Amino acid sequence: MHVDDFIEQMGRFHEGFDAKRAKRLAKAFDLDVKAKTGALSTGYRTICQLVLALSLDADYLLLDEPVLGLDAAHRELFYQLLMEDYLERPRTVVIATHLIEEVANLVERVTIIDEGRVLMQASADELRSSGYSVSGRAADVRAYCEGLDVLDVDELGGVAVAYLLGTPDAERLNDRLDTAPVNLQKLFVKLTEKGE
């Protein structure tokens, strides 16, 4: 079956499907609508699925690893088109992904799930400010961390970086310690590694 056949069939099966939009999106991605779907590369199969999904008029859009197999340019294009789509027609979009930093600026709420358990759920801004790192001499870092909610400590050659939940404790800090925010990707990794 060819890509344009898929587009035509989707229009028959889904009342809210916009075939014109699908063709515009296919063109934006340089997806050959005359190509057989079985001959498409992994990336272009993903693009074909995204074109179909973004052309549906649905209140909820669920995307599981939507950029799997896409190169960096196509991933950026997808995120741009997803935002344009949302601005034209606001709806709930759920994205399951391991490429957290790529979607960090697109999302309003984040749920971190590990092995079926919800570890954290909050607005993206709340999650961004929920963790931090402290680095310095290992002995100073260990002393700082005593009694705090430590996710993990990376240590190498007498220097350590600790990842913690909460906000820096100014009373514990000294001029030998540095603090920094933890991005969502690092927070996800450290939360899901905890206890391993």
Task: Tell what function each PLM region has.
Residues 152, 156-196:
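C-terminal coupling/interaction segments
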Residues 61-65, 70:
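Catalytic Walker B motif of ABC-type/P-loop ATPase nucleotide-binding domains
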Residues 72-74:
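Helix N-cap at the start of a conserved alpha-helix in ABC-type nucleotide-binding domains
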